[in-house]
């Protein structure tokens, strides 16, 4: 029987989602816990890969358990298909604090967490002053940033384009075309600021409001290339600092298929395209923040 699972995880202890030899990953952690509880090997398929250190909120995966009578689920007298609430409770009891299961439910045998996903959302957090309460999940850059220019550049991402300039080199995907449906920067107020009335010392004359000292970038698309979001954020920060124009950013967003990524023998060209964009930002401030079906 097939089950879907909704979970969140802190990516800092893991070398990404996907199982890899000699490294602890979220997928392996889940498979180990499920195998312990069901008494049989369990393979977990996720909605997509996240890189080392990247976090997730609302991540979706699926797994199969043997038919009735073939296993003792959790050693609690449940044979075959386990009760979702019981299995969810037991999973949270043995999973590390860095992983939490929000829900678990039976799905059809043809449900696929990766291939059935129509949209994936990512959020990247940024702050501009020293703050120990957001440091772990946000990137601190105390630069003067032109958010109007950054949002004008971000709006150019919308639509179906070839994002080869933002793809990590050395990947083996057949196409670098993605359809982006949402991309923008916005301010937010952290919990400790909102609830405790905390505010840093009075800002210098003409400084921006405190709300714009904490901001995030949100992007949604049907699919993402490896390292794509981090490369986009790094390049948008160059726009915000005035080191790259909005027009130059626009030149990195290619018409669908222009990079020739659908054909063989283009690795060298794709590598040279990546060098045109900015540096990737660190992964600790990136969240896979939702999956739609």
Predicted stretch roles:
Residues 1-293:
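Structured-RNA-binding interfaces characteristic of tRNA pseudouridine synthases
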């Amino acid at each position: 029987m097939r089950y879907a699972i909704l979970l969140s995880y802190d990516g800092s202890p893991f070398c990404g989602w996907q199982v890899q030899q000699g490294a602890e990953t979220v997928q392996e952690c889940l498979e180990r816990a499920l195998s312990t509880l069901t008494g049989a090997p369990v393979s977990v398929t996720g909605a997509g890969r996240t890189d080392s250190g990247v976090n997730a909120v609302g991540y979706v995966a699926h797994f199969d358990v043997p038919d009735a009578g073939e296993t003792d689920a959790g050693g609690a007298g449940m044979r075959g298909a386990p009760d979702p609430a019981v299995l969810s409770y037991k999973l949270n009891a043995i999973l590390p604090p860095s992983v939490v299961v929000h829900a678990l439910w039976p799905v059809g045998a043809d449900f696929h967490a990766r291939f059935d996903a129509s949209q994936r959302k990512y959020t990247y957090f940024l702050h501009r002053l020293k703050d120990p309460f957001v440091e772990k999940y946000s990137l601190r850059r105390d630069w003067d940033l032109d958010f109007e220019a950054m949002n004008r550049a971000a709006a150019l991402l919308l639509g179906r384009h070839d994002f080869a300039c933002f793809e990590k080199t050395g990947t083996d995907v057949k196409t670098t075309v993605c359809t982006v449906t949402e991309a923008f920067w916005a301010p937010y107020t952290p919990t400790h600021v909102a609830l405790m009335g905390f505010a840093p010392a009075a800002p210098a004359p003409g400084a921006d409001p405190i709300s714009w000292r904490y901001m995030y970038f949100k992007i949604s698309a049907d699919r993402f290339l490896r390292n794509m979001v981090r490369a986009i954020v790094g390049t948008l920060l160059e726009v915000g600092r005035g080191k790259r124009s909005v027009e130059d950013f626009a030149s990195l967003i290619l018409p669908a298929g222009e990079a020739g990524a659908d054909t063989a023998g283009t690795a060298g060209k794709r590598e040279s395209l990546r060098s045109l964009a900015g540096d990737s930002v660190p992964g600790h401030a990136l969240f896979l923040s939702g999956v739609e079906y």
